[in-house]
Amino acid sequence: MRVAVSGFKGRMGHEVVKTVLREADLELVAVLDHEPKEKNINEIVEFSSLDVPVFGNLSEMLEEIKPDCVVDFTTPKVGYSNTKTILEHGVRAVVGTTGFTPEQISELRSIAESKKIGALIAPNFAVGAVLMMQFAQKAAKYFPNVEIIELHHDNKLDAPSGTAVKTAEMMAETREFVKQGAADEVELIEGARGAEYEGMRIHSVRLPGLVAHQEVIFGAEGQGLTIRHDSYDRISFMSGVALSVRKTKELETLIYGLENILD
């Protein structure tokens, strides 16, 4: 498959480029960056042996290169518009950018189905993180008292993380509604109890040195259960990205969540 990478200078995008180069059935045909200084990726020392054009305009790249799939790891500010543009050009998309609303996902799914092309948006591409979410969903049926703590590097722009939101959404499907905490609790400092989703509390930590980590903490009379996943390196996401790129060939709709394509 001919693959283009949007946001290739970001930490995730850079790792995606290396992954595409490693995979025998994937070919890197273009990269995209906001206002790039380079015209070819070989102007970067690490990729000096390659011949891959660098673009600053997404539509121009799509029309000139006509890739089979675009992998987008950019920012929440442009993730939606990028994905919409990719799909409207009839090109498959794998998107790790977070911050999409349910309405935006629904609209993008309609575009993918009208074009009969596959696309996948996932808040997390680490298989271990997907398993964490599935385990938490099952546990929430029996432990409705639960809070989420997600921890990421301090350059992450959105909070809570897409993984935390997706986890809460999945738990809400099996969990009896409980508003977590005392009914008359008072926040002495606003926000001390974190964000709230369907009665569950979500806490976001941003610190240098972290990559991506999440704990789902359940409490009950006389017992507790903690489910935790840690990504220590961005390589942990790459098998999921490669799998998703290949899977788009089989789809004619947009899938939200890596768990929906795992066997």
Swiss-Prot record:
Localization annotation: Cytoplasm
Primary enzyme class: oxidoreductase
InterPro entries found in the cross-reference section: DapB_C (IPR022663), DapB_N (IPR000846), DapB_N_CS (IPR022664), DHDPR_bac (IPR023940), NAD(P)-bd_dom_sf (IPR036291)
Keyword Endoplasmic reticulum belongs to the record: no
Protein name per the record: 4-hydroxy-tetrahydrodipicolinate reductase
Pathway connected to this protein: Amino-acid biosynthesis; L-lysine biosynthesis via DAP pathway; (S)-tetrahydrodipicolinate from L-aspartate: step 4/4
Residues reported to bind NAD(+): G7, F8, K9, G10, R11, M12, G96, T97, T98, A122, P123, N124, F125
NCBIfam families: dapB
Species for this entry: Listeria monocytogenes serotype 4b (strain F2365)
